């Protein structure tokens, strides 16, 4: 079993030591297997002085690349692999959202407690049309990462 606290420290050090490349690696891994939301590391990167525009762009692109990998892994290995990676209850929740909401479900999932990687695995396993899936992933990551970055952008423009 992976020590999650140690893994989180590793990822934070990755951002600290490798900057934008670290953001890319964390973003890429999130839709595949990563137990921590990319947003934690986006905040860390900005607090370490990385440019918010590049962090937003890189994290969004990286998550999309990771989502492509996840989609095809899930499509090929399907439910059997998902059951090894996630508990059955999370898969059921993800499946329910996808069946109920389709493309909008992927976007909505970005704002729920359902881990994003579960949604990506469910989309691939149940063979959601790839183009729709990628549009939903792109929009969901763009909006979610943007919402995390927005306070850092506005802090210099709003005075109390």
From Swiss-Prot:
Q: Which InterPro entries match?
A: DedA_domain, VTT_dom
Sorted alphabetically, which Pfam families does this protein's record hold? VTT_dom
Q: What is this protein called?
A: Uncharacterized protein MJ0201
């Amino acid at each position: 079993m992976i020590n999650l606290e140690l893994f989180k420290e590793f990822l934070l050090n990755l951002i600290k030591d490798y900057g934008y490349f670290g953001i890319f690696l964390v973003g890429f891994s999130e839709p595949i297997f990563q137990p921590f939301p990319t947003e934690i590391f986006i905040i860390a990167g900005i607090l370490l002085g990385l440019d918010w525009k590049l962090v937003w762009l890189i994290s969004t692109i990286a998550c999309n690349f990771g989502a492509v990998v996840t989609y095809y892994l899930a499509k090929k290995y399907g439910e059997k692999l998902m059951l090894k990676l996630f508990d059955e209850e999370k898969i059921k929740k993800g499946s329910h959202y996808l069946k109920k909401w389709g493309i909008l479900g992927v976007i909505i999932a970005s704002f729920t407690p359902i881990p994003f990687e579960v949604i990506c695995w469910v989309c691939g396993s149940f063979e959601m049309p790839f183009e729709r899936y990628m549009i939903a992933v792109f929009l969901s990551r763009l909006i979610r990462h943007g919402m995390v970055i927005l306070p850092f952008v506005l802090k210099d423009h709003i005075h109390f």
